[in-house]
Amino acid sequence: MTRRAAVKAPRAGAAARRGSVARRTKETDVAVDLRLEPGEASISTGLPFFDHMLDQISRHGGMALTVRAEGDLQVDAHHTVEDVGIGLGEALRQALEDKAGLARYGHAVVPLDEALVEAVVDLSGRPHLTFNAKLPSGKKFIGGYDVDLTQDFLQALVNHARICVHVNVRYGRNLHHVVEAIFKATARALRAATAREGTALPSTKGTL
């Protein structure tokens, strides 16, 4: 695995709405850069289906996103998927350093043919994930991607962005459709929650 020198992430300003993270361990080498504005996605994790899902986050989340990840895929994809979630969560937290004026809450219901998924987001500052998803039985892998890692990815994202996310898979038969709808719905809810509505902090406590 090629090693990169770790880069200290720049402090994200309120106006920039940008986060940049470089994270290297003995198992993975991950770099994430995002801006909370529509833009291009450039994704490379060594897992084509996961790349496709991260592209959905960029497109439907209304964010420019670059992800580069190299991991011990010869062992398992878990380390790579989870560490990308950690990096994306940390970058998102940087981009949301100033929460004044944000909508805070986001909700989306996304269909993909026969599948229907609901996602709700609260930029609460308190990490929580409810993942209510009974995935279709039988097939477990999509192009080398273990669908069980979807929950692990979201948990890492939630923990490091310090946000609250609820995902409810209402129904679906095709596993690809269900997983893709999970990513799209979560991205759409994030886009709504991170939208600017004014200047006030959306909390009676005075902090998030």
Swiss-Prot record:
Q: Is Cytoplasm tagged as a keyword?
A: yes
For this chain, the family text in UniProt reads: Belongs to the imidazoleglycerol-phosphate dehydratase family.
MF term (GO), any: imidazoleglycerol-phosphate dehydratase activity
Q: Which residues form a coiled coil?
A: none
Q: Which GO terms describe its biological process?
A: L-histidine biosynthetic process
Organism of this sequence? Anaeromyxobacter dehalogenans (strain 2CP-C)
Please state where this protein is localized.
Cytoplasm
Annotated region described as Disordered, given as residue ranges: 1-22
Output this protein's name. Imidazoleglycerol-phosphate dehydratase
Q: What is its EC number?
A: 4.2.1.19
User: What catalytic reaction does the record list?
Assistant: D-erythro-1-(imidazol-4-yl)glycerol 3-phosphate = 3-(imidazol-4-yl)-2-oxopropyl phosphate + H2O
- Which HAMAP family does the entry mention? HisB (MF_00076)
Q: Where is the composition biased (Low complexity)?
A: 7-19
Main location, first listed in the record: cytoplasm
Q: Which Pfam families match?
A: IGPD
